[in-house]
Amino acid sequence: MERVSGLLSWTLSRVLWLSGFSEHGAAWQPRIMEEKALEVYDLIRTIRDPEKPNTLEELEVVTESCVEVQEINEDDYLVIIKFTPTVPHCSLATLIGLCLRVKLQRCLPFKHKLEIYISEGTHSTEEDINKQINDKERVAAAMENPNLREIVEQCVLEPD
């Protein structure tokens, strides 16, 4: 009977560990995702606003809570950013999204898939903008425009 109880206990602990509910799995997985989310936030918080002399962090366009990282598999992560424009009719929301994408594509040290959205209910044309900033062809076309590329470069430039 003791042997059966031990086997049952071992089996249950393995199932819980593999599903992420054990002492080690439960603490380990969220901690890694939190660290990666902070790493992402540290990269985007210093992006400058296209029309104001402030960073996106200072304007609360991005906050720590707007970054989510999920594990896709062992070496790949899904990074989701939900930013909040300063006003619901912000004409530069698409440009801000482009700056976020460019900075993260260049600087993230781990393999990732990137999804960038305007926080729900914070912009009058959020659906259209969300489509634009998550469309690879539109992003590539935007970065071919020398004037737009120069603005993006100025916004993502690291402060001294």
UniProtKB/Swiss-Prot annotation:
Example GO CC term: the record gives: cytosolic [4Fe-4S] assembly targeting complex
Enumerate the residues binding Zn(2+) 1.
89, 123, 150, 153
Q: Name one GO molecular function term.
A: metal ion binding
Where it mainly occurs, coarsely classed, is cytoplasm
Q: Does the keyword Cytoplasm apply?
A: yes
**Which keywords fit this entry according to its UniProt record?**
Chromosome partition, Cytoplasm, Metal-binding, Zinc
Residues noted as binding Zn(2+) 2 in the record, renumbered to the chain:
89, 123, 150, 153
Family annotation (SUPFAM superfamilies): Fe-S cluster assembly (FSCA) domain-like (SSF117916)
State the name under which the record lists this protein: Cytosolic iron-sulfur assembly component 2A
Originating organism: Mus musculus (Mouse)
What's the gene?
Ciao2a
